[in-house]
Structures are given as C-alpha cells and as structure tokens.
C-alpha cells in the first residue's frame, strides 16, 4: 500500500532519492541506470552527476566518471566531493599532475576532508616515484591479515578479513593478470596485496565492495574454467572446466581447506547484529527492503519515488504500476519545485 513518506520513512526515502554512496555500492550498475533515468527528468541536477561519477568509478569507467564529475562541477563549482571523484579518475589514468591540482582545489573548499589529504600524498609520491617506507608495525599487520578466496563458474572472489575500513581508504586496481590492493587500516598503517594471477580476468568487469566486516573483491573470469590455485604464471596447459564443489570447500591463501559456507554465515550474523543509529540505521533498513524485494517491489519503489519527488514510498507494483504517483509531502512540510 502506498503511504506518504513521513518521519523515519521520509528520511529513508530522501536517502534513496539522493542515491547515497551505500546504495550505489550495493549495485553500481543498477544505480548507474537509475541515475541516468533520473537525469533525463532533471538534467541540471549536480548531485546526480556526482553520484553517477561514483558509479562509473566503481565500474572502472574512469573517462565517463571524469565527464560526469566535470558536469557536476559546472552546475556546482563548490562541490569538494565532485573534485575528489574527478581527481581519483585522473589518478587512476596516471595523470598525476592533473589529479594533484584537482585534489588541491578540493582541499581549498574542504580543508577537513581526510580523503583529499590522503590522495594529495599519493599523487606526490607517484610524481616523485617514491614508495613509502614499510614500518615494523606495518610489516606486523601484513603478516597478521589473512585473505581467503573461492570461485564460482564466472568469478574468483577474494575476501580480505579487515574490519571497520572506510571505502575511500581502499584502492583496488585490476589488470588482465594482476591484482593490486592498498588499504589504509584504522591504525593508520597501510596493508598492500599484490597478486600475479594464474589465469586472465576481465578488469573492466571486476569490482570490489567495502563492508564493515570485510573487503570483498570479485574478479570476472573470461571463461568458465577451474582455477587450481590463485597465483601462477599461467602454466596450466589444459585448464579444466568449472564444476562446483558439492561441499563448498575452497582453497585459501593460507594453504588449508576452509568451510566457506560456515565463514560466510558467521560474517552475515555479525553484520546482522551490528548496531547502527540514526541515518546509518535507516539507510541499512532501506537497503534491506530494496535488496530483499522482488523485481516488482523494486520497480514500485523506484517509480513511486521518482514520480512523487521522493515523498511517497510504495512496494505495491499492482497499485503504482497503473497510475502516476502524485506528490504527497508530510503534513509538516510543503512541496516546492526548484
């Protein structure tokens, strides 16, 4: 049943309508498509362009991301977030001088943004061709942090068991035969992982996701073959076709067999019991409703929010699918078109 978005629901609906980072990270491709539709209706919306740039970054489409970030800055020159995203793309395209200039401009607008400071440092190090020294504590972290991996017919999935990491503190780069990950740990130390992969992957279809309990890296296989190990020089003459393991017991970096189903269950239980407050709790609730819903539920939610300007939330497709959803703001608010 359609209902006016009031109180917590109104807050949640605003989070959805603004395409928050957390929602985009759930499914960057779906968010990209929705933002493209939204921009058809509101072609001068700077935040929409900025968030679509984030979608492109997560999908590895850096040239498209730069274009959207620039458009966002044309509409709102004072957006430090748009400058951050433009700079990240320039950095990944190895245009370090331009990236440094962009990050510096963003820092002038928001000197308290730690992400801009960190990226400025990375650019300076890249320009100088220097690598930061590895401290003793950093080497200790490197030895303690473990990763596991498993595979499906279409993907190889690596999970870094690192908790409470901010998404902007994680940088993952894919190439056809290599994976490189750099993580700024909560302690302030860096963790790096570099792998020479056994078989090729499709970099542009490989992604990563930062969760509160782990970092999940998904590498797209070009063909459905079984990886006998994660690293190597491609010295397997005749790769075997992929056949799923019955018990889901997969190889890991620590060279012993792990019951992945049990591990995933433990992580999901920990995520489920995580205590969130305020907007974070509302955001998680809204993500859960959307991710667990059927295709009809998702269509109903998208249609009702877009047509009502974010004032109505409905999961009933049989109702909203056959009519235009009218604007219906909460009793204590007045709708204004800008």
Curated annotation (Swiss-Prot):
May I have one GO cellular component term?
cytoplasm
Using the UniProt entry, state the residues involved in the cross-link Glycyl lysine isopeptide (Lys-Gly) (interchain with G-Cter in SUMO1), renumbered to this chain. Answer: 268
Question: Where does the record say this protein resides?
Answer: Cytoplasm; Nucleus
Q: Which residues form the SGS domain?
A: 249-338
- Modified sites of kind Phosphothreonine: 257
Q: Does the keyword Repressor feature in the UniProt annotation?
A: no
User: What does its UniProt record remark on the domains?
Assistant: The CS domain mediates interaction with HSP90.
What is stated as this protein's family in its record?
Answer: Belongs to the SGT1 family.
The record's annotation in PANTHER family points to: PROTEIN SGT1 HOMOLOG
**Protein name, please?**
Protein SGT1 homolog
Q: Which organism is it from?
A: Bos taurus
> Which gene underlies this protein?
SUGT1
């Amino acid at each position: 049943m359609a209902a006016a978005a009031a109180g917590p629901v109104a807050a949640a609906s605003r989070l959805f309508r603004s395409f928050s980072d957390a929602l985009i990270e759930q499914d960057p491709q779906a968010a990209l498509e929705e933002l493209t539709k939204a921009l058809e209706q509101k072609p001068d919306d700077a935040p929409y362009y900025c968030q679509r740039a984030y979608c492109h970054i997560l999908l590895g489409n850096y040239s498209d991301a730069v274009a959207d970030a620039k458009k966002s800055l044309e509409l709102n020159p004072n957006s430090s977030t748009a400058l951050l995203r433009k700079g990240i793309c320039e950095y990944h395209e190895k245009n370090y001088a331009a990236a440094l200039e962009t990050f510096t401009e963003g820092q002038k607008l928001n000197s308290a943004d730690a992400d801009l400071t960190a990226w400025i440092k990375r650019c300076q190090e890249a320009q100088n061709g220097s690598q930061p020294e590895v401290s003793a504590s950093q080497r200790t972290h490197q030895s303690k942090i473990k990763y596991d991996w498993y595979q499906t017919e279409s993907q190889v999935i690596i999970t870094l068991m690192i908790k409470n990491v901010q998404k902007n503190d994680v940088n993952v780069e894919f190439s056809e035969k290599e994976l490189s990950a750099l993580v700024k740990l909560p302690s302030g130390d860096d963790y790096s992982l570099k792998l020479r992969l056994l078989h090729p992957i499709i970099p542009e279809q490989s992604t990563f996701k930062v969760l509160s309990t782990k970092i999940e890296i998904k590498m797209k296989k070009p063909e459905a073959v079984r990886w006998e190990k994660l690293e190597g020089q491609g010295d397997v003459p005749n790769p075997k076709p992929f056949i799923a393991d019955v018990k889901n017991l997969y190889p890991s970096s620590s060279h012993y067999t792990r019951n992945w189903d049990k591990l995933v269950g433990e992580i999901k239980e920990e995520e489920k019991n995580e205590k969130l407050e305020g907007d974070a709790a509302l955001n998680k609730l809204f993500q859960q409703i959307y991710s667990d819903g059927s295709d009809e539920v998702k269509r109903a939610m998208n249609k009702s929010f877009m047509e009502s300007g974010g004032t109505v939330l409905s999961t009933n497709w049989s109702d909203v699918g056959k009519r235009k959803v009218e604007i219906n703001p909460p009793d204590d608010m007045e709708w204004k078109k800008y």
